[in-house]
A protein has these predicted regions:
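Sec-dependent bacterial lipoprotein signal peptides
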Residues: 1-10
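Short secondary-structure boundary motifs at beta->alpha junctions and helix caps
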Residues: 47-59, 116-164
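Short alpha-helical linear motifs
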Residues: 40-44, 109-112, 145-149
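Surface-exposed short loop/turn segments
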Residues: 10-16, 75-119, 123-135
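A sequence-level detector of short, solvent-exposed, charge-rich linear segments
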Residues: 3, 88, 92, 108, ...
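Sec/Tat-exported extracytoplasmic proteins
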Residues: 69-77, 95-98, 152, 156-160
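A structural "domain/chain start" motif
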Residues: 9-67, 157-167
């Protein structure tokens, strides 16, 4: 009897896998920006290194988050023109966590424009945890990145509008 109870306490080992950047590209295309910005620097400052959380029996890693975010932002209208205002971006967190009923993908950026004071942007993309599959996890991270990228665009567009009003 005791052996049967102990067997029920064993856990399934986590399947370790790397998130695929092709699965994390923008799910939605943003409207063109109000005014242009240069993507000066993207750095990966995640305290967890390449670890990107877990969902169900899957534990994830993401090796080159800075390149992924750079690709996503360049696809959404950032430029390499040195005459434009410069955006510096640090990736502070990028992972997925879950409980029985919901999954919480987290993306946190620390951004500054032209060396100004930094702003923290955090995704708000929690959703129902259906099956805990690898594909579901990657879609959730892509949605979190879409959310924080949209917040960044809105912040920059508002800054651009106030900059033009001062002219």
């Amino acid at each position: 009897m005791a052996l049967g109870l102990l067997a029920g306490c064993s856990s399934v080992p986590l399947e370790r896998s790397a998130m695929q950047p092709a699965q994390l590209l923008p799910l939605a295309t943003l409207a063109p920006p109000v005014c242009a910005y240069r993507l000066d620097a993207v750095s990966d400052r995640r305290a967890a290194g390449t670890a990107a959380g877990s969902l169900g029996a899957h534990a994830f890693s993401l090796d080159d988050a800075a390149d992924l975010v750079r690709q996503r932002l360049m696809a959404n209208g950032f430029r390499d023109d040195p005459a434009l205002p410069a955006l510096s971006l640090e990736i502070r967190q990028l992972y997925i966590a879950a409980n029985q009923s919901s999954k919480v993908p987290v993306a946190v950026y620390r951004v500054s424009v032209d060396g100004g004071p930094p702003t923290i942007l955090r995704s708000h993309a929690a959703s129902v945890n259906w099956n805990g599959t690898e594909a579901e996890s990657q879609r959730a991270i892509a949605r979190a990145l879409d959310d924080v990228d949209l917040q960044l665009r809105q912040m920059l567009d508002a800054r651009c509008g106030s900059r033009h009003a001062a002219d």
